[in-house]
Amino acid sequence: MRVFTMGTFDVFHAGHVEFLRKCRLLGDQVIVGLNTDAFAESYKRRPTIDYAGREAVLRACRYVDGVVPNDQPGGTAMALILAVAPDIVAATMDYHPSNGKDWFAQVGVAEDWFAKQGIAIEWIPYTQGVSSSAIVARL
C-alpha cells in the first residue's frame, strides 16, 4: 500500500518522526509531498530551513521512501495526488475539520473526490507538546 502525506516539515522534530512512523504502519511505501518554500509562505510563514534542507532530512528518515515537491499550482494538490497514485492519504488530526481547520480546503480537493478515486483518508493523532512553530518561537 502506498501512503502519501503532505507538509512543510520545518525544523524536523520527534513529532514529525512519530507521524511518519505511523504513516509507515499504514503501508509499505511512504511518499511525502514536501511544501515548497513559496507555497508554505503563502499560507503560514517562510520555512526556517529551505526546501533542499528539509528534503535532505526527510530522505534520511527511515520511514520515508520518496519526496516530491508540493507547490499546489492553482490552489490544489489534485494533480500531485493523482501523480503519486496513493492508496491512502494521511493527515494529522489537528487539521481535521472537527478541530476547526479544513484540511480539504487547504489541499484544494473536496472530501468526496478521494472516495471517488478509491483513496482512503487516514487521520493520525497529533503529537502533543512539540511543534515547529513553538520551537522557532523559542529561538
Name each region found by the language model.
Residues 1-139:
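Nucleotidyltransferase catalytic core that binds NTPs
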